[in-house]
Curated annotation (Swiss-Prot):
Organism encoding this protein: Rhizobium meliloti (strain 1021)
Active site, per annotation: 50 (proton acceptor), 61 (proton acceptor)
InterPro entries: Aldolase_TIM, RibuloseP-bd_barrel, Trp_synthase_alpha_AS, Trp_synthase_suA
GO cellular component: cytosol
Gene3D superfamilies: Aldolase class I
PROSITE patterns with a match to the protein in the record: TRP_SYNTHASE_ALPHA
Recorded name of the encoding gene: trpA
Name of the protein: Tryptophan synthase alpha chain
Pathway(s) this gene product operates in, as recorded in its UniProt entry: Amino-acid biosynthesis; L-tryptophan biosynthesis; L-tryptophan from chorismate: step 5/5
EC number from the UniProt entry: 4.2.1.20
Length: 279
């Protein structure tokens, strides 16, 4: 875990609440608006920012995030430009962890060694690469860890106790528990099932467990955050961005303020939650 990531989790845990992890697609709807959104996320109360890297074949993404990726690619967004977004944000904010989330193909084409060097220089703290299983850790996970960049794994309800230790073996930063199977943006899971799932994962790792997929409102965030170390919100933010755009997919005066207002509400929900361990 990077020092910045570790410090953020420690600071938030001292407040007796979960972290709020916010995701949006880098370059959606354009580069400059994305940078403004990153800044607005932090101002609104995001503790960690997941920055999506657009890819032409996003197999794990729901329709909203697929459309966001298409808008970003159409606007000329690339892995290099996503790293530039991180670098520009980091120049003004030295404390908020940045996690890049995407697929291996753009990184492979970019070059793993070059990518890790540039990510480190840009101030990236962690990676989520959804199509690299633990059996391929030598491709990117191990080199990233050697550079001091966290490699965050996804666990799901179908990740059984035999598979879980393998998934967690080289995981760093936090564990991202996908609270349902399927694609991003599905319906909210039953909060009563979250506590048991988090406890099961924590039996295998000391890492924080953040729960995502389906969180849309402050009430959702509060309910999920009651038993998790973090709440991940993505599709709701992506939908908010999309709803503010012109018919041509361009940003409007409402784009950034709309995201900021949504995330302020989510942050209030998270701040109202209490970790089970503190109750």
């Amino acid at each position: 875990m990077t020092a910045r990531m570790e410090q953020r989790f420690a600071d938030v845990a001292a407040e007796g609440r979960p972290v709020l992890v916010t995701y949006f697609m880098g370059g959606d709807p354009d580069f400059d608006t994305s940078l403004a959104i990153m800044k607005a996320l932090r101002q609104a109360g995001a503790d960690i920012i997941e920055l999506g890297v657009p890819f032409s074949d996003p197999m794990a993404d729901g329709p909203a995030i697929q459309l966001a990726g298409q808008r970003a690619l159409k606007a000329g967004q690339s892995l290099a430009k996503t790293l530039e977004l991180a670098r520009l944000f980091r120049a003004e904010d030295q404390r908020t962890p940045i996690v890049l989330m995407g697929y291996y193909n753009p990184i492979y084409i970019y070059g793993v060694e070059r990518f890790l060097a540039d990510a480190l220089e840009a101030g990236v703290d962690g990676l989520i690469v959804v199509d690299l299983p633990p059996e391929m850790d030598d491709e990117l996970c191990i080199p990233a860890l050697e550079k001091g960049i966290s490699f965050i794994r996804l666990a799901t309800p179908t990740t059984d106790d035999r598979r879980l230790p393998k998934v967690l073996e080289n995981t760093s930063g936090f564990v991202y528990y996908v609270s349902m199977t399927g694609i991003t943006g599905s319906a909210l899971p039953d909060p009563s099932l979250i506590a048991g799932a988090v406890a099961r994962i924590k039996a295998h790792t000391p890492l924080p467990v953040c729960v995502g997929f389906g969180v849309k409102t402050a009430d959702h965030a509060r309910a999920i955050g009651a038993s998790a170390d973090g709440v991940v919100v993505g599709t709701a933010i992506v939908n908010q961005i999309a709803s503010s755009l012109t018919e041509e997919g361009r940003a409007t005066e409402a784009t950034v303020p709309g995201v900021e207002a949504l995330v302020r509400g989510l942050a209030a929900g998270v701040r109202a939650a209490r970790l089970a361990a503190a109750e």
